[in-house]
Structures are given as C-alpha cells and as structure tokens.
Amino acid sequence: VLLHAGAGLLQGAMGIHGAFVAGVPMVVISGESMTYGEQPEFDPGAQWINNLSIAGGTTHLVDSIVKYTSVAGSVHTLYESVVRAGELAQRQPTGPTYLSVSTETLMDSWTPPANPRAVPPAPRMLTAPEDIEKLAAQIAKAKHPVVLTEGAGQEVETYEALVALCDKFALPVVEKPGALFANFPKDHP
C-alpha cells in the first residue's frame, strides 16, 4: 500500500489499525522529502517544507498500529527493506508493517539486484496434533458443546473446515458479536 507522505498515512490510519486488529499482513509505504529542494536537479516542490513535513519522520505516526517500522534510506537498501517488511508482515501474528521511503528514493533510478535472495513463502502456523486430540476428547466428553467463533474466517480453508466439523458432529455455533471475519454461514441450518 503506497500512501502520500504523512497526510496520506494519517488518512489511512484507520484502515491500517483495522488490519492490525484483524491480523491482515500488508506493507505500507509512505515518506517525505528529505532534501526540500536542496538536492541538485531535484525539486519536490515548496509544499514539503511548508505543509507535508513531519518532525522526526513518519514512522512514529504509526508505530503503535503496525508490527514493525523502518526507513529505507536509499535505492540500495529499498529492495531488501521491502522484502524484510513483507516477511515480517506475514509472520505470526500477522499484521501490517511500515516503511518510510523518501520521495528522493522513490523517484531515483533503481536497478534490481544481480542476485536477489530467494524469498521463502510465508510460514504457516499449524496446531500440534496432540492439541487437536485434546480438543477432540473435550468435545466428545461435553454434554452440550458449542463453538464460539471470532477469527476463523480469515482463511477459506479454516472457514470450510469449521463448517465441516460442525456439520459432522451437529455442533451449534455462536459468532462473537465483535467477530473480525465472517466465520460461519449466516444461513446455515
């Protein structure tokens, strides 16, 4: 997600916070001018020094609603910074990360690295088999088991597995009023 300077970052703060609460992985990038027209042959415009600069940089605007903040200071560190922010966004618990990338860096010429490192797929967190067995035993012993949902709908596979489990054992489902996702079909018998 590319947002405009501090102003766009603040306008996007509610969406970023929602992603943080819901555990939605994303990389958010914005930045500001670092040279304010003093860099030869690069004039970002007068609006930067007058209206768009944030004292101390933009990272502190969102550091409480993202997992990680950093500054990509040049085109030489940009690729690896984006990869790292993406990896961190996808690691458990998932959520948004933020990179401050200056206008000068965004506008600079970039050559991809000759040998970019292979980016591994995001790790998946799986429940230990012994925990699944414990849960199955608890459900089997319960006289009137009920499933309470909150965040199962984030992944299609989890959603479908929950429906199949509840169908197989005729388990009633209650969705928490503040559920983060659609966790169970509303029209399910």
Language-model segments: residues:
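N-terminal alpha/beta PP-like core and its mobile active-site loop of ThDP/TPP-dependent enzymes
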Residues: V1-P189
